[in-house]
């Protein structure tokens, strides 16, 4: 039996008293996290490689008001664990000069705290958070999908003035019945996915309309005076538009990945390096050292499309669902020339340009759709790698 972590998100509307308690919990969690960040800022590889980090007990002794907080003590410990994860990510990715832990702010659009020692029972249609925080009403449409006895932890989150309770369950997920399909997938900018069956899949038009809504609200924000009440109100509207876009894209990716996993036993994909693919265009200089045209505007537009379409999120969903449901997902090398190889005779068309969507093989004369041909080659190469590994 293999247990998996599965989350369920339940929106709720707290009472005025409960909302005030939750806001204090968010603030206390931020305080504990920021104390860790402040200690980390004293870190120096040469002079102070091991700064002293305060623990929960020490912070409660030094700050009596924290001892009376309605937040569960376990949630304060989880704030320290979250900081340690952020610190580990920083040291792991320090070569990029990013991901340094930063102070949490009360102005962040997302506020949350997590309790890993939950109550595993229901009071009718209400879930009790704790004695001090009270309970949350769960509506019929949000009824629990898994037994409450399997609850692992819960998180209360406020995102753009909307509260939600995220329940994390330990669930035994059974593999699905064996499917017959074997496909290759080519990710693209013009179409989100091209399958080796010839099917091309793109995001629905509604997603593009939501993107236009974000741009429109962002333009309005740029005209507001920073720090004014109008600016703060418009910033909340922009954050809400971004959240709506993100949730819609995430939901579409879940539906699409579920369908591909349901229909196919074997899936072949490219190995993606999104960080490298979305770098700026290299500078080009002429003989006199003056800058030349380097296609930076087109490269910038392509980078926006790659990041907007959320390739990494879709690949992650396919990966964990394939593992859950007993499917085989193989990723081919990122330098494999899937678009340039003729699927019928194996000839390599070295002069293929990005603007050429269709091409004819010089050796066998068979016409190819660039993306469908790439998906077929990815499928065959993934099958070959799978046989070698077996």
Segment roles from a protein language model:
Residues 37, 41-44, 87, 91-98, ...:
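Long, hydrophobic, amphipathic alpha-helical segments used as structural scaffolds
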Residues 8-12, 136-142, 146, 201-203:
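Generic detection of short hydrophobic beta-strand segments and adjacent strand-loop junctions
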Residues 7-9, 114, 124, 133, ...:
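Broad gene-expression machinery/nucleic-acid interaction feature
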């Amino acid at each position: 039996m293999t247990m998996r972590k599965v989350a369920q998100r339940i929106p709720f509307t707290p009472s005025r008293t409960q909302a005030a308690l939750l806001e204090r919990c968010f603030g206390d969690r931020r305080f504990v996290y920021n104390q860790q960040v402040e200690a980390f800022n004293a870190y120096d590889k040469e002079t102070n490689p091991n700064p002293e980090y305060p623990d929960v007990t020490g912070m409660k002794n030094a700050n009596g008001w924290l001892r009376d907080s309605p937040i569960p003590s376990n949630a304060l410990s989880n704030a320290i664990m979250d900081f340690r994860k952020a610190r580990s990510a920083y040291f792991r990715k320090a070569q990029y000069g990013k991901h340094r832990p930063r102070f949490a702010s009360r102005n962040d659009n997302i506020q949350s705290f997590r309790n890993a020692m939950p109550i595993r029972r229901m009071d009718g249609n209400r879930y009790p958070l704790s004695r001090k925080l009270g309970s949350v009403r769960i509506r019929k449409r949000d009824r629990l999908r898994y037994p409450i006895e399997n609850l692992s932890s819960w998180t209360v989150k406020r995102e753009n003035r909307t509260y939600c309770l995220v329940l994390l369950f330990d669930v035994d997920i059974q593999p699905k019945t064996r499917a017959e399909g074997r496909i290759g997938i080519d990710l693209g900018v013009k179409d989100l996915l091209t399958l080796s069956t010839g099917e091309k899949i793109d995001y629905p038009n509604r997603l593009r309309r939501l993107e236009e809504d974000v741009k429109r609200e962002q333009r309005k924000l740029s005209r507001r005076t920073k720090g004014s009440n109008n600016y703060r109100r418009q910033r909340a509207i922009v954050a809400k538009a971004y959240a709506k876009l993100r949730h819609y894209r995430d939901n579409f990716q879940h539906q699409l990945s579920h369908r591909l996993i349901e229909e196919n036993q074997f899936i072949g994909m490219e190995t993606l390096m999104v960080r490298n693919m979305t770098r700026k265009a290299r500078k080009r200089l002429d003989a006199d050292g003056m800058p030349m045209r380097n296609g930076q505007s087109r490269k910038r537009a392509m980078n926006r499309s790659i990041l907007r379409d959320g390739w990494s999120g879709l690949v992650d969903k396919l990966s964990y669902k394939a593992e859950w449901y007993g499917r085989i997902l193989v990723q081919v090398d990122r330098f494999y020339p899937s678009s340039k190889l003729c699927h019928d005779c194996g000839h390599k068309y070295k002069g293929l340009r990005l603007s050429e969507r269709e091409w004819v093989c010089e050796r066998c004369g068979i016409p190819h759709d660039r993306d469908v041909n790439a998906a077929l080659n990815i499928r065959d190469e993934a099958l070959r790698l799978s046989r070698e590994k077996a």
